[in-house]
From Swiss-Prot:
UniProt-annotated location(s): Cytoplasm, Nucleoid
PROSITE patterns on file: SPOVT_ABRB
Gene transcribed to yield this protein: mraZ
Domain SpoVT-AbrB: 5-47, 76-119
Family that this chain belongs to: Belongs to the MraZ family.
Alphabetized InterPro entries for the sequence: MraZ, MraZ_C, MraZ_dom, MraZ_N, MraZ_sf, SpoVT-AbrB_dom, SpoVT-AbrB_sf
Gene Ontology MF annotations: DNA-binding transcription factor activity; transcription cis-regulatory region binding
Official protein name in the record: Transcriptional regulator MraZ
Amino acid sequence: MFLGEYEHTVDEKGRLAIPAKFRAGLAEGLVLTRGFDQNLLLYPMPVWRELAARINALPITQPSARNLRRLMFAGASDLGLDKQGRIVLPPNLRQYATITNQAVVTGMDSFIEIWSAERWQTVLDSFADEAPALAEHVSAFGI
């Protein structure tokens, strides 16, 4: 289970330390890909395999299914942690997420999001205004 938010430096080689609490959950490998909100998504390999199977089951005749495949698979990188518990963020993904020297790693239970520090702050700031409407909206789902 991945929970919490952690700010880390991205070094000149694009290396980002993954929080120590998260590393055991990534021992079987991981996949890094583009997210939906100009962020990056980091999946443990077992979770990625399940997600990929569901995406691959979508009909290729639907434009939205093709676009989802492009978003999730075209920029994806199969990675591993180095001895210091870091991953290398590929340049194309750093550019997509506008990550320069600071990144925020957030636990999303079964996967991890990686944000530029600036973009994450914008997301947090929006919560103050949107929280009541969000609470009302998700109540329809029984949450």
